[in-house]
């Protein structure tokens, strides 16, 4: 094959708009269906959907974390208490005074 002919065929191949076709179609459909039967993906999806539906029926679908912005937020001192925060301050002050840290 001459140099000119090789260059023309390479140009034709690389300028293709559509990807090369698989001779017998894609194996994804059978592979995906096989995988879902092995892993139980469809059963898990059905369980999740029914769980969401039951939680939505009681009104807790949004969960406790998604509170409106107008709700009161808890201060850090309410979580830890005054004793734990003062101990931390003393510990850090002590290490700085000893020259360690």
Swiss-Prot record:
Residues 55-74 bind DNA. Residues 1-10 have a biased composition (Basic residues). Keywords: Activator, DNA-binding, Transcription, Transcription regulation. It comes from the Bacteria. GO terms for molecular function: DNA binding. Residues 45-60 have a biased composition (Low complexity). Residues 1-26, 45-101 are annotated as: Disordered. Increases the production of several extracellular enzymes, like alkaline phosphatase, amylase, protease or lipase. When present in high concentrations, delays the production of pigments and sporulation. This is Secreted enzymes activator. It comes from Streptomyces griseus. The gene is saf.
